[in-house]
Amino acid sequence: MAVSHRLGHVALRVQDMERAKCFYLDLGLRLTWEADDWCYVQWPTGEGIALLSPDHKAAGPHFAFHVQNRAEVDQVREQLLAKGHSCGPVHDHRDGTASFYMQDPEGNWLEMLYEPAGGLPSNIGAEPIPLTYS
């Protein structure tokens, strides 16, 4: 099953959001999205890390392969199902992204994700959100 994709992001559960955020910003990543229970830091080349607070419920720790278009999300899912893998349903999100989650044979969660060009700040390398350090 050859699919054009790239490793786009990794999502990590963190206990101290501010401490984790400062660590990754000090490494040179930029803050491109921030919400109450998660944030997204990104290299200028587009790869990023989603930092998830203990209260974040939408998704847990995982890594994501970014595919080239919306049709590939369905194509990859169908190919995986045909090979006997279990996959969650495809979700079309209000921001134009589409994805599904699954586990590899070792139980690691992964996401197959399409992000349209010009979408959320997490996928366009937007300017960082100003932070106040204490």
Regions found by a protein language model. Name each.
Residues 45, 55, 116-118:
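Solvent-exposed strand-loop boundary residues in beta-sheet-rich modules
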Residues 4, 11-49:
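Core segments of cupin and vicinal oxygen chelate
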Residues 35-38, 58-59, 94-98:
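Short acidic/glycine-enriched loop/turn segments that link adjacent beta-strands
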Residues 1-18, 63, 118-134:
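N-terminal beta-strand motif that seeds the catalytic metal site of vicinal oxygen chelate
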Residues 7-14, 55-79, 83-134:
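Vicinal oxygen chelate
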Residues 37, 54, 113-115:
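Residue-level structural signal for beta-strand termini and adjacent loop
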